[in-house]
């Protein structure tokens, strides 16, 4: 009996050990996500946890679209879901024409249908029943591949970092079988994109010829005009014009008053099929993001997505809605006296759109600026962004408003004497851009080596997304066409080019990217020439930050260069002398052509000076708002009075002291229009207004003919800094500033022989000041003048 009990005890222990080891973790196979990973088990019907391999597995091994499918995931030690105790969900879709279709839930949406059952520690399972097709409700769409991601409930953890895929057999529905290519020359005058020539017909064309001269095996068009139906006939099949490198088709009998939606369908017979929107679309429909745009910003009735669309869809209308411009001949008066307000629509008003910004135009006029630089407004991925992630360059982003709203905003600006400058991003494009999708290395999730527009890897160290090759004639033609379109269609007054240092094909590092590059210079001059062919008065500004030799050559050609004074003005604003010299923002310092620099204290990209003063200020600047705003005003007096174009970042005039890192660097920032109700912040805004209006009313003081002298290096920290300006008609300014924490007696004396002396800001007439030093309070300044403005 004792022996029998011992045997029974050993059997129980063995069973316990076997059960516990069945879901223990083995070495993680990194290859498990490449058509992951199937099942080695000969017992195909047993899905108990005892038989599960690590990683993603499924039963049956060779699933049929009209049968049930069970998907299991066992987290290896290296998986982020290993040891995770919360709910686990499957994010899945049918891979159709290169996109995930019939996805049951958004990434951050947890629904019961997608919740996996926990089988044991680190083991989860889900069954797609009664069949794969019915579970996805995919209708008559052929199912040949599923995309799979196993995630935590908040989406922050993935079981496998890369997307996984399961091949499926579909015996009921088959993918469309394209016909052989028909070669035919495009109609004369046809260009890439949507060719509307009047009447009721439109010719569509898109370029497809890779670096090696190869092209896809077929191309079709789908749209409202053919009921989104693929057919091997003239309603859908596109012709091939190999001499032009294009697929094309003419669609006839269209209603000129109707807006149509369409896509291209192209691919290779033995490879992936993709849907493309037209790269030259002036309006797109985005099924993932349009639904979140408020009705007041863009009417939902104008964003109806087609049932049979997949991914981003293009639209067109033969009889376009014409905007009636009130201002057709606006011109920038003086490009060397631009006073630019850099504005981000999302963070400028509570509505985060064009209409909100339009309601503040009178405020901006009152402030005294004469130009607005809009951060990128061409279609970008998502709705909530700085905009430096462009995907469609000819379409304005709907998150800010309709096409007419953009035009009205520009028209209203022109009515008020304000120029409008678009911030444009041609260094790169996102993977949603048709040029990126057309030649895409899905295995490595990057640009394909045969892509004729993009570099596989950027030659410079500042790459984001997909890097345009600006020495490609295809790229240069595209960019020049887009620049001309924006000037003609929206009547804007110029451009600020983002990251032009990246317009290089020279392999370089952080230490060499700024070196002189004659090819980069040639590209930028070519773009400048194209702009001036369309509008000879347009201003062209570069975010370049290259060597002086290169920047001077570009400035001598007529372009203007961003000049970053943020560090120096943050230092002076905080009351610290080290690194606080202002000399670099003035063209006279290094022989730059007058007006060649657009200098700034702040930009969208830099930390806010008032925040730095609040956080790191010397003495009581951290706690004393009155002194902090005085320090910001002293900065302003020694910035806006320097000749040459200037740029202000939005709300700098209010002493906005929320960090750029608040809610993430590019994240939404809080509004503080109530700042203007505070006496100290209002006084700062008034200082901006006084000097900006001076620059507009007396431009000769800030012209190349005026005499300008200043002492603003670190060596003038003690004893006050000063600026002297005299116009050719005898108007004079003398500015003295104390950036320290102690009262200072200026080392420079007030000039003699002016006749009359005024405190320009207070308008008080002064006596007995000529030839004398000035006592200046901490963080304060005074502007002496021999005149007053009306």
Task: Walk through the language-model features, giving the residues of each.
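Substrate-binding/active-site clefts of carbohydrate-active enzymes
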Residues: 281-285, 289, 321-322, 326-338, ...
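Active-site-proximal helices and loops of the catalytic beta/alpha 8
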Residues: 378-379, 384-389, 499-601, 638-641, ...
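Contiguous beta-strand segments within globular domains
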Residues: 59-75, 196-203
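C-terminal beta-strand-rich structural cap/linker in extracellular carbohydrate-active enzymes
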Residues: 769-790
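Short beta-strand elements
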Residues: 158-174
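Basic K/R-rich, polyanion-interacting modules in nucleoproteins and related proteins
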Residues: 173-219, 275-336
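Bacterial Sec-dependent N-terminal signal peptides
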Residues: 16-58
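Aromatic-rich carbohydrate-binding modules that target alpha-glucans
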Residues: 82-140, 155-163, 205-257, 267-289
């Amino acid at each position: 009996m004792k022996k029998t009990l011992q045997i029974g005890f050993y059997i129980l222990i063995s069973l316990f050990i076997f059960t516990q080891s069945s879901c223990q973790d083995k070495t993680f196979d990194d290859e498990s996500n490449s058509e992951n990973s199937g099942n080695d088990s000969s017992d195909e019907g047993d899905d108990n946890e005892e038989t599960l391999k690590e990683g993603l597995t499924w039963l049956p091994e060779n699933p049929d679209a009209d049968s049930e499918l069970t998907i299991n995931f066992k987290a290896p030690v290296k998986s982020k879901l290993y040891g995770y105790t919360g709910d686990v969900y499957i994010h899945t879709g049918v891979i159709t024409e290169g996109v995930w279709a019939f996805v049951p839930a958004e990434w951050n949406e947890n629904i019961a249908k997608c919740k996996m059952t926990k089988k044991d520690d680190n083991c989860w399972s889900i069954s797609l029943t009664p069949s794969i097709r019915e579970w996805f409700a995919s209708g008559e769409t052929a199912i040949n591949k599923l995309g799979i991601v196993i995630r935590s409930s908040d989406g922050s953890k993935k079981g496998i970092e890369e997307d996984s895929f399961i091949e499926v057999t579909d015996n009921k529905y088959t993918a469309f079988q394209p016909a052989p290519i028909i070669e035919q020359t495009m109609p004369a005058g046809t260009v890439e994109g949507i060719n509307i020539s009047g009447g009721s017909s439109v010719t569509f064309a898109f370029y497809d010829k890779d670096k090696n001269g190869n092209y896809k095996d077929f191309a079709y068009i789908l749209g409202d005009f053919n009921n989104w139906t693929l057919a091997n006939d003239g309603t859908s099949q596109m012709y091939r014009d190999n001499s032009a490198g294009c697929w094309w088709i003419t669609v006839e009998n269209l209603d000129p008053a109707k807006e149509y939606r369409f896509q291209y369908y192209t691919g290779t017979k033995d490879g992936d099929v993709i849907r493309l929107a037209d790269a030259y679309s002036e309006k797109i429909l985005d099924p993932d993001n349009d639904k979140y745009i408020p009705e007041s910003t863009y009417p939902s009735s104008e964003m109806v997505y087609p049932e049979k669309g997949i991914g981003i869809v293009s639209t067109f209308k033969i009889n376009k809605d014409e905007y009636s411009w009130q201002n057709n001949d606006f011109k920038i008066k003086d490009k060397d006296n631009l006073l630019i307000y850099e504005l981000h629509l999302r963070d400028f008003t509570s509505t985060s759109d064009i209409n909100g910004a339009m309601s503040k135009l009178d405020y901006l006029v009152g402030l005294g600026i004469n130009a607005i630089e809009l951060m990128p407004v061409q279609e970008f991925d998502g709705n909530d962004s700085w905009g430096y992630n462009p995907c469609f360059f000819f379409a304005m982003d709907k998150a800010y408003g309709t096409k007419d709203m953009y035009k009205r905003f520009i028209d209203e600006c022109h009515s008020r004497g304000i120029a409008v400058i678009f911030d444009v991003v041609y260094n790169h494009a996102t993977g949603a851009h048709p040029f990126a999708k057309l030649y895409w290395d899905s295995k490595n999730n990057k640009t394909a080596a045969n892509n004729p527009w993009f570099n596989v890897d950027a030659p410079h160290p500042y790459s984001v997304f997909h890097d345009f090759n600006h020495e490609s004639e295809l790229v240069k033609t595209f960019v020049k066409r887009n620049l001309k379109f924006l000037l003609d269609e929206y009547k804007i007054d110029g451009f600020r080019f983002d990251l032009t240092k990246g317009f290089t094909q020279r392999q370089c590092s952080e230490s060499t990217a700024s070196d002189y590059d004659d090819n980069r210079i040639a590209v930028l001059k070519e773009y400048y020439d194209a702009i001036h062919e369309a509008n000879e008065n347009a201003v062209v500004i570069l975010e370049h930050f290259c060597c002086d030799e290169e920047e001077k050559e570009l400035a001598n050609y007529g372009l203007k260069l961003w000049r970053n004074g943020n560090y120096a003005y943050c230092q002076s604003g905080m009351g610290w002398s080290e690194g606080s010299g202002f000399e670099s923002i003035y063209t006279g310092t290094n022989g730059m052509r007058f007006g060649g620099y657009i200098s700034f204290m702040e930009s969208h990209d830099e930390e806010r000076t008032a925040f730095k003063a609040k956080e790191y200020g010397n003495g009581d600047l951290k706690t004393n708002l009155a002194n902090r705003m005085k320090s910001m005003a002293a900065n302003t007096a020694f910035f806006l009075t320097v000749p040459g174009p200037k740029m202000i970042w939005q709300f700098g005039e209010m002493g906005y002291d929320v960090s750029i890192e608040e809610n993430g660097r590019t994240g939404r920032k809080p509004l503080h229009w109530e700042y203007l109700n505070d006496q100290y912040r209002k006084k700062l805004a008034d200082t901006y207004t006084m000097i900006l209006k001076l620059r507009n009313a007396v431009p000769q003081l800030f012209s190349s003919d005026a005499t300008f002298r200043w002492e603003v290096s670190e060596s003038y920290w003690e004893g006050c800094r000063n600026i002297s300006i005299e116009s050719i008609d005898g108007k004079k300014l003398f500015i003295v500033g104390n950036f320290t924490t102690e009262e200072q007696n200026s080392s420079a004396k007030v000039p003699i022989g002016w006749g009359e002396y005024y405190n320009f800001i207070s308008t008080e007439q002064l006596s007995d000041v000529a030839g004398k030093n000035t006592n200046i309070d901490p963080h304060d300044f005074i502007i002496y003048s021999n005149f007053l403005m009306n």
